[in-house]
């Protein structure tokens, strides 16, 4: 059995849950649902939901931090 040795992201992660953000400045809006699983290179994948379609997928924690809040 493989053990995950990656630290959990910043405790401020809880503040992201429920946030509505966009992919870059002009991208589609998405809602951050929560932590999903470890990703590549020390990153984590977060569960997100596309606002317009309801589709759920995973997205990089680092990218979420860089994406702007939806207006």
What are these regions (language model features)?
Residues 1-19:
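Mixed-charge, Lys/Arg-rich low-complexity intrinsically disordered regions
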Residues 5-7, 22-24, 59:
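Serine/threonine-rich, low-complexity intrinsically disordered segments
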Residues 26-29, 53-55:
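Short acidic/polar mixed-charge low-complexity motifs
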Residues 28-36:
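Short beta-strand-centered aromatic/proline hotspots
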Residues 42-47:
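Short aromatic-glycine-enriched beta-strand elements
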């Amino acid at each position: 059995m493989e053990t995950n040795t990656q630290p959990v992201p910043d405790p401020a992660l809880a503040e992201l849950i429920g946030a509505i953000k966009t992919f870059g400045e002009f991208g589609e809006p998405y809602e951050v649902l929560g932590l999903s699983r470890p990703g590549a290179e020390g990153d984590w994948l977060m569960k997100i939901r596309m606002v317009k379609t309801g589709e759920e997928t995973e997205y990089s924690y680092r990218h979420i931090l860089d994406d702007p809040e939806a207006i």
